[in-house]
């Protein structure tokens, strides 16, 4: 009897320990790891709720493309100042099954009635209906889903429909832009109605509901992309743009098609290959920067001492300057022959020639780098990186251009439209440095403007993704993407440090190197000793998101400059 009681007692103790263990383990198992390393799949973007939507899409059996679309639909709500369905995007997609990369071009195009001298002032290209180009976002989602989707199209819209109806707290990024652009918003009745309460713009944490966009999303979920381009939404879209002075027609929407690019730009970095879009984006600029710099064989030792670090950053800035000088020759390859320009910008021989012109002791006047024209800045963007369980990946960047785009927001559909023509060159306007506008970037019907996007996927010789990276932040996108790659690949920084490390930017025109406030003073001093003009950035330079393959899984990092955390499982 005693023996029986002892055994029962021991069993009771074991049972209690098991229950306690489960109580301690289960909550922590449901949490995301503190170091943001995920064993199966990962996502990085600048809106946490949207990442959770993407992650849940993956868990439900969705592909990397499914997750990207579901998350981007959400980002279009939570960061409406940067992107949405009235804009356009590019996607770089890597299929782990086939081992092939591709690019989908769903950027806006000029309406058929557009012409080079259509703007009487630069302000006209920034605000109002005339600044609106034909949106491509939804056609891009459609093509990507047709090629790589697993879940039903309508399923991808459901979480965002619910979010738009129920509302969500205004995030850090949107709140900052609302405050900064308060005067502009006050002048636009529809924006005022959407983003203000009690005569004040919404602040961080206050609830924003978007019922009209919820209805629009529902229509797209049911009818597909056709609803936007020649279905039940089309007539209202045309009416809204034309009522604001625009020239987009039903024919423009009917004829819009996203473009599949089956052979994206690629360059070798050691035993890996980088895939990215070519011109009309800035993939060739990124390629030239990295090709120039890889000849220096950078390593962690390159930034160990103040002297080494100063020289290394000087070389990086000089590579930026040479690359941006050549950027002025890029344009839409359907309208401008950029074959030779892109061939040079991706040539290791050409990069070596430019490297030989870099002096370790001084920078040079602008003319030394031989810029021929200038290209305008681009603005508000959103980037997203995804790696799915099967190892497939998506790097996607969408942009409305300047914050809140054209400021034209439909009172019926809730769609906020782009102002994509601020990134086109205007023939009548020479910039403040005396450089003429680039003819390669003049407006023509059906043409797309040059942008700084560099949505990149790095793949090893084994066919496995090593890194997915991209950025948001206008012209600085290219240099910030380059720095994130340099920091991780050559300096050996982990992905979080690669994304957070202070950055600098130089686009040649103006002749200034912008540095973040917390950058190492040894870097600034070394640059000034070498005759660089430096200035402290008034705000963060750009925002980077990245995912890197590690021994422990997928390490994801979200730039704290804009707030949020990555997601995965």
From Swiss-Prot:
The record describes its post-translational modification as: Not cleaved by autocatalysis into a large and a small subunit resulting in loss of cell membrane localization and catalytic activity.
Is Endoplasmic reticulum one of the keywords?
A: yes
Residues with an annotated glycan are: 230, 511
The active-site annotation reads: 381 (nucleophile)
> Keywords for this entry?
Cytoplasm, Endoplasmic reticulum, Glycoprotein, Signal
Per UniProt, L-glutamate binds at: 107, 399, 420, 451-452
Family annotation (InterPro entries): GGT_CS, GGT_lsub_C, GGT_peptidase, GGT_ssub, Ntn_hydrolases_N
Q: What are the record's GO terms for cellular component?
A: endoplasmic reticulum; extracellular exosome; perinuclear region of cytoplasm; plasma membrane
Family membership noted in the UniProt record: Belongs to the gamma-glutamyltransferase family.
State the PANTHER family in the record: GAMMA GLUTAMYL TRANSPEPTIDASE, GLUTATHIONE HYDROLASE 1 PROENZYME-RELATED
- What protein does this entry describe? Inactive glutathione hydrolase 2
Q: Which organism is it from?
A: Homo sapiens
Q: Its gene? A: GGT2P
